[in-house]
Amino acid sequence: RLVLFGQRIGGPNILDAIGRGDREGIRAVILDSTFASYATIANQMIPGSGYLLDESYSGENYIASVSPIPLLLIHGKADHVIPWQHSEKLYSLAKEPKRLILIPDGEHIDAFSDRHGDVYREQIVDFILSALNPQN
């Protein structure tokens, strides 16, 4: 009855582990403000640097393998560290069951902040409870 939760670089690490490893007991995956590709995010930070990185660990390579485990992606649309389009791309590559929450004025890893926690915490708890108790 594990729920895996990854923020930022933790997201691709979780996706890589699920794609390559044992998934037994994993009931849900939540990714907050993560990125789809190491090279893409590196190029956004330092133009031209992406070609130096090994893309074999990028989340976009493994996101489809999460299914049938329920997946929740969360991202702030005002994130200036990792653009929200990364979560949108991961969502488009993922298989059902999946859910995407975009926080209109949310910044980087802002879903649990004082500013947004009350709004999104309930949705996240509902997602977890639904994943742990799929009969309800």
Model-derived features with residue positions:
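Short alpha-helix in the alpha/beta-hydrolase fold that links the catalytic acid
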Residues: 59, 83-92
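Acidic catalytic loop of the alpha/beta-hydrolase fold
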Residues: 78-82, 109-110
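Hydrolase active-site cap/lid region
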Residues: 13-67, 113
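Alpha/beta-hydrolase-fold serine-hydrolase catalytic core, especially in secreted/extracellular enzymes
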Residues: 130-136
